[in-house]
Swiss-Prot record:
Site (Transition state stabilizer): 74
Record's protein name: Catalase-peroxidase
EC number(s) given by UniProt: 1.11.1.21
Gene (name only): katG
Catalytic activity: H2O2 + AH2 = A + 2 H2O; 2 H2O2 = O2 + 2 H2O
Cellular component aspect of the GO annotation: cytosol
Length: 713
């Protein structure tokens, strides 16, 4: 058995998130194009196949009410609902619900059966239909089959075949524990759920108690971290709870076995074995809470909202030993059908999280408005559901299939279509010359391009240089972008753009988004030339400029970096070690350890640092693309001494004279301290390493500049 080095040396830097960016664990051919394969599907045929299995109840796991639709809705919701805005991680893409740890979360109990029911559909369409898409599509088909009109569906989610090691799910080591709140009672970022192993909040209430006010507060915080406002939150909960029931025929602690990750091998990946009664149908145990929300659990109607608002609800312990709510005088007892179609009736119940919506004045106002306006409720749920299941997919260019709505919504970060011709090689050369002849230095050109492009997050495919949103709020006011200096730089860019565009007699124009990237490319080429290397940085025009109306300021605020080690920037809000934040930023940029290393070394050589600090600029020729950063970080003629107790800034001193040569931060020193990063740095810091360094920097720089160019795929 290999040693778990993370436990042996917990302070060592963890590169698992970056390593997965370099690994190919997908059994499909590396040249396989899922987008192309998906569009070969007859989506209507796929939906018919899903609906067929949805109403074909299996003896080994009977469908509640003869219809797997409610189970499929829960499956789709819990797949997409892991998304959080703070770092863009989670969500339906990747199909992580079928992989650990998510497949074994208590909140996903018995969803393994839902995926097994769907296997014949997945088996039929194979590589043309990912699990990630199928899970979400099944939720949509379920809603439609029970009388609800959905807003649309987009495919394009590829499957992953290993857990996402970049996601911080929380500090707890036990499921359903909640040790994540800080001393001030705040849920730390980037977490979205309030409890380990749950998608959002404890349905019984905070800490398993029926506290309505506390439950409403948890709901608002958790759904807010998923980018949902109060109306969307109420619409999602009310819409989802219109269907199906929860299962708690008896106490899960006494009757239910472990999740898939802990199940015996003969169960073949099925978890939560239940020895109560038949272990299925009316005897099913999932959450430990028991009952439906209404008397029509397989049809779209207003009964959930009507029941919640029109009756008084009181807490009680259900048959599974969990807190749930019943009507005050039992008006809805024995009112709902049994899951197996028998003559025995079931009691209608509510969760603490349901009644919390009624107690909270803001949520209640939305509920009452929906009750009075059913069409408004239908539309709100349709759009909130669409947002839920597509939030992590990025811009509309990635949305595939015949059911993609024509309307682009603000949360999709829309961009305008170009109503002009893009620049060609001749114009590119002309504009490069104008940029290099301007008052902007190499460092300014590089920093502006980096600030624009490095907002990209591969987690949810948001951000990037396309749109030139760096000139709009909130990005132009972010501390990391040095607002005053950025404003001056943008003024120069806009003047060059205006002069070029106004001089054209044809339809060729340059967008500011393209011009900013081109400026960075030109600066890199100039810096390489000054170091003796003739390079051309690849450039593909076609970016357009977003408008303020196309930019949700609050939504984009989630992209603001608390640290950017590539620019040697660390804010007061940063709560983790700088080197850990550097790795996290590199992962969001889909970089590997060598790519992260070469970018930092190049940015330092170019002098592209926050507030033009000399920290980390280990060269006498800033603005020249040399390997000096690596040469000097590896030089044993020097030693490092901290200049403060927090050991975040250090002085590089000559061992013999004690003279201070340079200053650096933990962002810099990690490349000499960490054994893996030092090994990579040695390649670039060797006497024959500079040419390789320049080539690799150009390749990686170009990669970052076009991370968001889904229009080129």
């Amino acid at each position: 058995m290999s040693i778990d080095y993370k436990k042996l040396w917990p302070e060592a830097l963890d590169f698992e998130s970056l390593d997965q960016n370099a690994q190919h664990v997908d059994p499909k051919d590396e040249d396989f194009d899922y987008a192309e394969a998906f569009q070969e599907l007859d989506l209507e045929e796929v939906k018919q196949d899903i609906e067929s299995v949805m109403t074909d109840s299996q003896e080994w796991w009977p469908a509640d009410y003869g219809h797997y639709g409610p189970l499929f809705i829960r499956m789709a919701w819990h797949s997409a609902g892991t998304y959080r805005t703070t770092d863009g991680r989670g969500g339906a893409s990747g199909g992580y619900q079928r992989l650990p740890p998510v497949d074994s979360w208590p909140d996903n109990a018995n969803l393994d059966k839902a995926r097994r029911v769907l296997w014949p559909v997945k088996q039929k369409y194979g590589q043309n239909l990912s699990w990630a898409d199928l899970i979400v599509l099944a939720g949509n088909v379920a809603l439609e089959s029970m009388g609800f009109e959905t807003f649309g569906f987009a495919g394009g989610r590829e499957d992953d075949f290993a857990p996402d090691e970049s996601v911080d799910w929380g500090p707890e080591e036990e499921m359903e524990a909640s040790d994540r709140y800080d001393e001030a009672g705040e849920l730390p970022e980037p977490l979205g759920a309030t409890v380990m192993g749950l998608i959002y909040v404890n349905p019984e209430g905070p800490d398993g108690e029926p506290d309505l006010e506390g439950s409403a507060a948890n709901i608002r915080e958790s759904f807010g971290r998923m980018a949902m406002n109060d109306e969307e939150t109420v619409a999602l909960i009310a819409g989802g709870h219109t269907f199906g029931k929860v299962h708690g025929a008896d106490d899960p602690d006494e009757h239910v076995g472990g999740p898939p990750a802990d199940a015996p091998i003969d169960l073949q990946g099925l978890g939560w074995e239940n020895d109560f009664g038949e272990g299925k149908g009316p005897d099913t145990i999932t959450s430990g809470i028991e009952g439906p929300w209404n008397t029509t659990p397989t049809q779209w109607d207003m009964s959930y909202i009507d029941n919640l608002l029109d009756y008084e609800w009181w807490p009680e312990k259900g048959p599974g030993g969990a807190w749930q709510w019943t009507t005050e005088s039992g008006e809805l007892d024995a009112a709902a059908p049994s899951v197996d179609g028998s003559s025995e009736k079931e009691d209608v119940m509510m969760l603490t999280t349901d009644v919390a919506l009624k107690r909270d004045p803001d949520y209640r106002e939305v509920l009452e408005r929906f009750q009075e306006n059913p069409d408004e409720f239908q539309e709100a749920f349709a759009k909130a559901w669409y947002k839920l299941i597509h939030r992590d997919m990025g811009p509309p260019e990635r949305f595939l299939g015949p059911e993609v709505p024509e309307e682009t919504l603000i949360w999709q970060d829309p961009l305008p279509d170009a109503d002009y011709d893009s620049i060609g090689d001749e114009e590119v050369a002309e504009l490069k010359e104008a940029l290099l002849d301007s008052e902007l230095s190499v460092a300014q050109l590089v920093k502006t391009a980096w600030a624009s492009a490095s907002t990209y997050r591969d987690s949810d495919k948001r951000g990037g240089a396309n749109g030139a949103r760096i000139r709009l709020e909130p990005q132009r006011s972010w501390e990391v972008n040095e607002p005053a200096a950025l404003a001056d730089a943008l003024e120069t860019y806009e003047a060059i753009q205006e002069e070029f565009n106004s001089a054209r007699s044809d339809a060729v124009r340059v967008s500011l988004a393209d011009l900013i990237v081109l400026g960075g490319n030109a600066a890199v080429e100039q810096a390489a030339a000054d170091a003796g290397y003739d390079v051309t940085v690849p450039f593909e025009p076609g970016r357009t400029d977003a408008t303020p109306e196309q930019t949700d300021v609050e939504s984009f605020e989630a992209l603001k970096p608390k640290a950017d080690g590539f620019r040697n920037y660390l804010s007061d809000e940063a709560e983790r070690k700088p080197e850990e934040l550097l790795v996290d930023k590199a992962d969001l940029l889909n970089l590997t350890p060598p790519e992260m290393t070469v970018l930092v070394g190049g940015m330092r050589a170019l002098g592209a640092t926050y507030q033009d600090t000399d920290r980390g600029v280990f060269t006498d020729e800033p603005g020249t693309l040399t390997n000096d950063f690596f040469v000097n970080i590896l030089d044993m003629d020097y030693e490092w001494e901290p200049v403060s107790e927090d050991r975040e800034v250090f002085e590089l001193r000559d061992r013999e004279t004690g003279e201070v040569e340079w200053e650096g931060t933990r962002f810099d020193l990690i490349f000499g301290s960490d054994s893996r990063l030092r090994a990579i740095s040695e390649v670039y810091g060797a006497d024959d390493g500079e040419a390789e360094f320049v080539e690799d920097f150009v390749d990686t720089w170009s990669k970052v500049m076009k991370l968001d160019r889904f229009d080129l795929e």
